[in-house]
Amino acid sequence: MLSVNELALEIFDNLADLAEEFNAVYHELDNGARIVDCGVSTRGGYAAGRAFTEICMGGLGEVNFRMGQIKEFPQPFIDVNTDFPSIACLGAQKAGWTVKVGNYFAMGSGPARALSLKPKHTYEVIDYEDDYDCAVICLESDHLPNAEVMNKIAEECHVDVANTCAVVAPTSSIVGSIQVSGRCVETAIYKLNELGFDTRKIASAIGTAPIPPVRGAKRAMGVTNDATIYHGQIQLTMNAPEIKDYLEKIPSSKSKGYGKPFNDIFKEAGYDFYKIDTSLFSPAEVIINELSDGSVYRVGAVNTDVTLKSFGLQ
């Protein structure tokens, strides 16, 4: 069976060995845990953002960058593809682990989740878990984890703390913008899973989303989510004729809150994340190629006006 931690470790080791070339900083704690800072006390960049995103996908996704346009505005875009969408996106990339130890808080994602089985139901549904002896976690945080945090992660993953690795970046950073936009495919897989569709039937997935500008900590969560909600474009290839029953519920435009920048929606919800319609967290546009009869379906559309408003370009 494929090990997402083993595959991610290869990318992590390269990032750690060549940290300076990635504008990253490598740390080894007294307990042996290894950490690469991709944006907390260093600027990071596109190379670090690619490595962070590919680690987050358990080494089962490929990331590339290009320049595109939104209306007349040139914008960087991230392109993501995987031939193991269920494992890469739900089994690794999904931000399904809230890491809270003492005063430390981070959103945890990446292959270490497949060892800790967080959340367990996800791994039951996709029928996958890892048993590798090293854990690699991605932490979205403004602070680096200390030895106590890494000990807790190791304990939850049932590995020695010296075999525990973390890449860390704040949402409000170059790497933060890249890795959140790099979840564009994951949002489609996540949405279908939430709707009850068996995502193991998805053979391949490819997607693109603009990489938003870094607009400060207060705007970071909103602007990074808007990149996919209003401009994420995904194509899924699958052998599942029943997909036609799910089509209309997939795109973000079916959400009650759709049509405003995320930060406006968040403000209207009294800054209570749990009051936001979760169906909003979906890509803007999805193309599905169903292999059993060769059907091709399209749902949703990009919303350039809201994207540009969120990005500060209107």
Swiss-Prot record:
Name of protein: Methenyltetrahydromethanopterin cyclohydrolase
SUPFAM superfamilies per the UniProt record, alphabetical: Methenyltetrahydromethanopterin cyclohydrolase (SSF56199)
Family statement drawn from the similarity comment of this UniProt entry: Belongs to the MCH family.
Main EC class the enzyme belongs to: hydrolase
Listed pathway(s): One-carbon metabolism; methanogenesis from CO(2); 5,10-methenyl-5,6,7,8-tetrahydromethanopterin from CO(2): step 3/3
Protein's organism: Methanoregula boonei (strain DSM 21154 / JCM 14090 / 6A8)
Cellular localization per UniProt: Cytoplasm
An example molecular function term from Gene Ontology annotations: methenyltetrahydromethanopterin cyclohydrolase activity
GO biological process, one term: one-carbon metabolic process
Pfam family, one: MCH
Predominant location: cytoplasm
Signal peptide limits: none
